[in-house]
Amino acid sequence: RVKGIAYMEAIIEPPGAPRPAPAPGSTFDIYRSARGEQAVLQENRFVESLISGLDYYLTDADAAEYRRPYLTPGESRRPTLTWPRELPLGGEPRHTYELVRDYSDWLAADTAIPKLFVRAAPGALLARPEALAFVRGFKNQREVTVYGPHFVQEVSPDAIGRALAAWLPTLR
């Protein structure tokens, strides 16, 4: 039985407001094109861009751990190519967009399950005004704000831990 849902930087789709398609030549446009095979499977750009975006927050040991499953070029890196291709952007791929839209609608309608929204500021996925307004409308929810980008858990782990520690005892 689910007693509560805590989330941060979740992939959520407000009604009628899908994330825009990637701009031509952007990182996600490259990942989703034939050029993605070289960029991700051979050059490991997905993992390396994640690490470079967290430069000040990851130790060398942390960065090595992020790289560890993907040290060998080729198919070992396939999950890091599949994921950006499955992320619903511009309503595509349709099956993923519909799945995300369905669970987003469920989260918005549910009143029984307590929710904790750990808002990352400045954040990324939930920084769009329509996305932020949508999740703030979820019922039976508390919100806390912590500093960080999309990978907020690497930037503010202690603040997230404190928020969870304060929220968990409120669950029945």
What are these regions (language model features)?
Residues 13, 125, 151-155:
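A short, basic/aromatic alpha-helical/loop segment that forms part
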Residues 45-59, 65-72, 85-91:
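Helix-loop "lid/cap" segments that line or gate small-molecule binding pockets
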Residues 138-172:
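Catalytic active-site module of serine/aspartate enzymes centered on a nucleophile-bearing elbow/loop
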Residues 32, 36-42, 62, 68-78, ...:
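Ligand-binding pocket scaffold of soluble enzyme catalytic domains
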Residues 51, 64-67, 81, 161, ...:
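Non-transmembrane alpha-helical segments in soluble domains
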Residues 2-47:
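Flexible "cap/lid" loop of the alpha/beta hydrolase fold
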Residues 16-27, 77-81, 128-131, 155-158:
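Short aromatic-enriched loop/helix-cap "lid" or pocket-rim segments at secondary-structure transitions
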Residues 57, 75-136, 143, 147:
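Conserved serine/cysteine hydrolase catalytic core
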